[in-house]
């Protein structure tokens, strides 16, 4: 096995121009490398730049600064030897399974006989033998995603990039396809030498990956790297597996060092009037508080456990948990979600008392809500144009 890296990213930065001439920084200071025989996971919430980084690696976009190297050479444009499987099935509906798979070879001016041979081999490898003449509309979601895998593998890439390839599938179909992929990888039956998997499913990352890079947001950056040394096949119920999942939850909910004045960490994060608020409904907040307040959690829940119980992934759970923390209804600490005294009171209150508690916390801890309330109270009509507040908020964009 060659010890030199298949892929290297050195100080990669990506920014997009904004209408006012400033730039929106999406990725900053990205340093990573992928070596032969590795499955590397990029784990983080939506908006942390994982998919953007994947497109830079594939040559579908250019970095604003830094360099991506494949086999020691800079990536400039789509790189032959790197293939991608997308979250959506991305199939041409007017083409058959065979034609969709063969499409990747058509542009390589390959002899027709070789195209047919390799396409049929990829279709058979991924478990679609007998469906060569079927159209995408005739296939289930899992089968359509298998076509996506076959189309990527038919070009015999060295590196396979997977952008949340299982997230659009139901739980059982995703588990089957994930297991089949790992079996093919372990048996060495696929032509690929390395894999980069983008996911926001912590258990999926621990189940599949040898290394996990945990991403932070605004801008996207690598917070930590976690090596997974558990033998394959991995068991979700194994204590070592659960410990690693717990460790990642702790990493992703840890407060930044020096977050408070003078380097002191604040117990609760604060908001400004222009802070971007999580898009979370009060019914979801109420539901999570009720779940944590009830047995067996009784006010303090282990995040992996509550996520499993409620069938929520990190992109669903974290915004809700963080909103509860912003409103002082709960505290995130060490991978746990602990309700405050007011959070417990809310969970056990009737509907009218809940409204009073929620209003009190909303006005106390969300400056924008307090500002809107103050403006309305100052007016005899108790009304104001929406554009007034939008104009004010534009100063923070």
Model-derived features: positions:
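Conserved ABC transporter NBD signature motif
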Residues: 66-77
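The feature captures the beta-strand-to-loop junction immediately N-terminal to the Walker
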Residues: 43-45
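Short coil-to-helix segment of the ABC ATPase nucleotide-binding domain corresponding to the Q-loop/switch region
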Residues: 95-102
């Amino acid at each position: 096995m060659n010890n030199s890296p298949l892929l290297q990213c050195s100080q990669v930065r990506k920014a997009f121009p904004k209408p006012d001439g400033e730039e929106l920084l999406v990725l900053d200071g990205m340093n990573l490398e992928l070596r032969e025989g590795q499955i590397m996971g990029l784990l983080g919430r939506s908006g942390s730049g994982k998919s953007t980084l994947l497109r830079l690696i594939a040559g579908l976009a250019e970095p604003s600064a830094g360099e991506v190297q494949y086999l020691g050479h800079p990536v400039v444009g789509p790189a032959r030897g790197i293939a991608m499987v997308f979250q959506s099935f991305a199939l041409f509906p007017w083409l058959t399974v065979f034609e969709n798979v063969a499409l990747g070879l058509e542009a390589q001016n390959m002899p027709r006989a070789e195209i047919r041979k390799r396409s049929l081999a990829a279709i058979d490898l991924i478990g679609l033998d007998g469906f060569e003449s079927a159209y995408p509309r005739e296939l289930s979601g899992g089968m359509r995603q298998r076509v996506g895998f076959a189309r990527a593998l038919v070009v015999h890439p060295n590196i396979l990039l997977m952008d949340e390839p299982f997230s659009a599938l139901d739980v059982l179909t995703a588990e089957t396809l994930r297991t089949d992929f790992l079996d093919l990888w372990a048996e060495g039956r696929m032509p690929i030498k390395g894999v980069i998997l983008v996911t926001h499913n912590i258990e999926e990352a621990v189940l599949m990956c040898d290394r996990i890079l945990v991403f932070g947001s605004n801008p996207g950056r690598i917070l930590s790297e976690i090596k997974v040394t558990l033998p394959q096949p991995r068991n979700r119920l194994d204590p070592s597996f659960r410990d690693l999942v717990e460790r990642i939850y702790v990493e992703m909910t840890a407060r930044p060092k020096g977050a408070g004045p003078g380097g002191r960490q604040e117990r609760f994060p604060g908001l400004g009037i222009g802070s971007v608020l999580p898009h979370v409904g009060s019914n979801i907040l109420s539901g999570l508080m009720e779940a944590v307040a009830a047995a067996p959690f009784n006010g303090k829940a282990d995040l992996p456990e509550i996520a499993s119980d409620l069938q929520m992934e990190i992109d669903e759970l974290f915004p809700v948990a963080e909103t509860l923390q912003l409103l002082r209804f709960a505290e995130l600490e060490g991978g746990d979600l602990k309700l405050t005294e007011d959070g417990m009171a809310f969970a056990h209150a009737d509907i009218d008392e809940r409204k009073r508690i929620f209003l009190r916390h909303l006005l106390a801890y969300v400056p924008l809500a307090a500002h809107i309330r103050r403006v309305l109270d100052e007016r005899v009509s108790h009304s104001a144009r929406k554009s007034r507040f939008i104009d004010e908020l534009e100063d923070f964009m």
